[in-house]
């Protein structure tokens, strides 16, 4: 759904950004007994097929590709760096004159929420397209939706 939406609406955006976990040694983020809130089973391990973008997302040829969580837990795309330039997302968005963000993807309760909250904190107008994201659980999704709404994130369906 995400790749189809972005492909259909790419001309509406000045910049397309992808982000992905790229864990090298994320410390206590990985656990043999994860709580699925702060600790997780191994995932997004750098250099593995599982860490790669889905082929449909990779085919979008994003303007900025963010890797995050190399050496610690990092839910927000603002915590990572662009693969090509090694620059942080905030700097790259500012340099492009971007002032608003539409955030989609997985998981609404974690990475989407933290990226949206950081975007608002950094002065962007932020929307999350509710039909293009899913939480880890309904309960965590409700909590994330409340946090985002309270912070000024607009939660809306996409136009498709």
Can you describe what each PLM-predicted range is?
Residues 41-42, 50-64, 138-160:
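Structural recognition of alpha->loop->beta junctions
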Residues 98, 124, 153:
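Short phosphate-binding/catalytic loops that engage adenosine nucleotides
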């Amino acid at each position: 759904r995400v790749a189809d939406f972005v492909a259909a609406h790419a001309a509406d955006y000045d910049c397309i950004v992808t982000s992905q976990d790229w864990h090298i040694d994320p410390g206590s983020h990985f656990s043999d007994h994860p709580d699925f809130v702060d600790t997780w089973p191994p995932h997004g391990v750098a250099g593995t097929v599982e860490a790669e973008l889905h082929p449909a997302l990779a085919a979008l040829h994003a303007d900025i590709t963010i890797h995050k969580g190399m050496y610690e837990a990092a839910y927000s795309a603002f915590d990572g760096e662009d693969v090509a330039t090694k620059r942080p997302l905030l700097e790259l968005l500012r340099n492009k004159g971007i002032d608003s963000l539409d955030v989609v993807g997985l998981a609404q309760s974690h990475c989407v929420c933290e990226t949206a909250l950081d975007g608002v904190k950094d002065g962007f107008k932020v929307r999350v397209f509710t039909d293009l994201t899913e939480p880890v659980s309904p309960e965590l999704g409700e909590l994330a939706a409340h946090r985002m709404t309270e912070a000024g994130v607009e939660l809306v369906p996409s136009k498709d």
